[in-house]
Amino acid sequence: MGKIIGIDLGTTNSCVAIMEGNTPKVIENAEGARTTPSIIAYMEDGEILVGAPAKRQAVTNPKNTLYAVKRLIGRKFEEKEVQKDIGLMPYSIVKADNGDAWVEVRGQKLAPPQISAETLRKMKKTAEDYLGEEVTEAVITVPAYFNDSQRQATKDAGRIAGLDVKRIINEPTAAALAFGLDKNEKGDRKIAVYDLGGGTFDISIIEIADVDGEKQFEVLSTNGDTFLGGEDFDQRIIDYIIGEFKKEQGVDLSKDVLALQRLKEAAEKAKIELSSTQQTEINLPYITADASGPKHLNLKITRAKLEALVEDLIARTIDPCRTAIKDAGVKVSDIHDVILVGGMTRMPKVQEKVKEFFGKEARKDVNPDEAVAVGAAIQGQVLGGDRTDVLLLDVTPLSLGIETLGGVMTKMIGKNTTIPTKFSQTFSTADDNQPAVTIKVYQGEREMASGNKMLGEFNLEGIPPAPRGTPQIEVSFDIDANGILHVGAKDKATGKENKITIKASSGLSEAEIERMVKDAEANAEEDKKLRELVDSRNQGEALVHSTKKALGEYGDKLEAGEKDKIEAAIKELEETLKGTDKAAIDAKTEALATASQKLGEKVYADMQAKGEAGGAEQAAGAQAGAQAGQGAPHDDNVVDAEFKEVNDKK
C-alpha cells in the first residue's frame, strides 16, 4: 500500500507532507518551494497553470487567474459573504443552476471543488515526484469552522483530483498533532491553537493527554469565522491605496482590473514587509493613464497605519476565542501553550493581541505555514495503521438539528460534540392523516431554523392515516469522523425508512463529480501528449544543432551529394519543428539522423586520427544526435538544459 499524504489546502497557499518513519517531511514543489500558491490560471490555449507560474502572470491575465477560491467552496451564490467577494474579485463569480457560487472563466462555468482540484493535483504530483511512485490516498485539512457543505465540497475536490480522501481533518487539530508529537512534556496539557490564514480564522482548545504511553488529542471546543483572513487584510491596504491615489490624482483605480491586480500584489508585499520593518514604500510606475499622460503611484505606508487599517479585523478574532474558552469549560489561565498557525500570525499586532488575551507569549517553535500539512501526514500514518500511539478526538463545530412546528430549530447534536457520534429522537405528525413528513436538516446556533444553514431535506412517505401526534417517526443523526452528516428517518409502525448522506441541497451531484473526474483525466492525457511533443521537439532541435555544427567543420570532406542530402534533411526537419505533429517531427528527426550517418563516421574517423578530446566532444554530439533519431531509448528523466561553451584559453 502506498503512503497516505497530508495536504493543507489553503486559501492563499497549500502544502504537502509525508511521514518517513516517524519523521515528517514537507515536500518541495517543482519550483523548489515548500508551499504552493493556491492560484490557478486558465490560458488561452487551454493550458492550466497552478501555483507560482499562475501567480507570475496574474497581472496580465486577471480575469482568468483564480485565487482564494476556498472562500467560495460549499457556498450559495446568495450568501452575503459571496456577494461581498463579487465586488472585490477580478474574476467572474456566477450563480450555478443549483444555486451555488461558481466561477466563469473563458466562457466556461467551473465549480469551486473543480478549481481546488487543480491545486490538489499539483500537491499529489509534488508527492509523487518525491516518492517516485503513484499516490492515491490523502488526508486533507479544512478550517475547523467549516460546515457540512464545505467539508463535502472539499472531499469532492479530492475525488476530482484523483485522490481517495481517507479523512477530512480540522486545521487547528492537525497543527496540535504536529506540535504535540514533537514535544516530550509529560502529563496533561491544554493548548489553544489560534489559526489565522489567508481566508479563514479558527480557534480550538485542545487537551493533550498521556494515556498509557499513547498521546490523546481531545478537542474541547472550537470556534471561528470562515470569512476572515489575510485576503481581508490585503483588501484594506488596497482600499487605502485607491483612496489616497484618488485624492492625489483624481483617478479611481477600483474600476481598472489590471491596476487592481498590481495593487493586490503590492498590498500583499507591503503587508509582509511591515511585519519586519516600520515603514515600506509602494512604488507602481505607469499604474494608469489619462488625457494628461501616464500616472505613477508612489506611497509610503507605516506599520502604525497598517495596524490602524486592520484593527477591527484583528479584534474580530477575539470574540471567538472568548466563546471557545467558555465552551471548553476552562479558564484562560488553564491554557499551557498558545500555538499560532497561518501566515497572518506573523504580524506583530496579531501576536500582541493574542498575548493580551491569553496572558502569555505564543510558542515560536511551530512553523505557521507547515504545521497543518505535517499534522495531516501524521493522521495519514495513523489511518494507514503505521502508528498506534496517537488518538485523535475531534468535535463538530456547529449544532445540527431539524426544523419542527413553527419553524423552530430542534437541536439533535450540540456544537463541540466529539465525533464520530450518533443520536436519534422520535417525532410525530402535525396534522391529522398526514401521509408524509419532510425532514429539513439545519446547521447553526440560532433558535429559529431560518437563521441557520440548511444542509438538505428529504421525505418519509407512506405514513398510515392517523390522528396528529400518533405516528412515531424516529429521526437519527450520524456524524462520521470526517464531520460529514448522515440522516435517517423511520416510521416505527410500518418500518419504512429513508436515509440520506447530507449532500448540501446544492453541492455537486454524483454525475457531475464523475464528469469532472473524467475531464481531469482527459486534461492529464492532454498534458502528457503536450510533454511528449515538447520532448520530440527538443530532440529534433538538438539534432539540428549538432549536425549543423559538425557540417560546418567536416562538410567539405563529404561528397557534394551527401552534403546536399543532409542540408535538405535539416531544412525539412526545421520546417516540421514549427508545427505540432509529433509523429512528423519524429519521422524527420530519424530521416536527418540517417542522412547524417556518413558525417558521423567522418567525424569519428577524424577524431581517431587526431585523438583530440575536442573532436570527441564533437563526434559525441553528432553520434548522439544520430542515435536519438534512430530510436535509441529515451530517458524521460533527462532534461535538456541550455548551456554556453566557455573558452578559458586566453
Curated annotation (Swiss-Prot):
PROSITE patterns: HSP70_1, HSP70_2, HSP70_3
Keywords of the record: ATP-binding, Chaperone, Nucleotide-binding, Phosphoprotein, Stress response
Record's note on what induces expression: By stress conditions e.g. heat shock.
Region (Disordered): 609-638
Low complexity composition bias: residue spans: 609-632
GO molecular function, one term: ATP binding
Residues with Phosphothreonine modification: T200
Function per UniProt: Acts as a chaperone.
Assigned protein family: Belongs to the heat shock protein 70 family.
Protein name: Chaperone protein DnaK
Gene that encodes it: dnaK
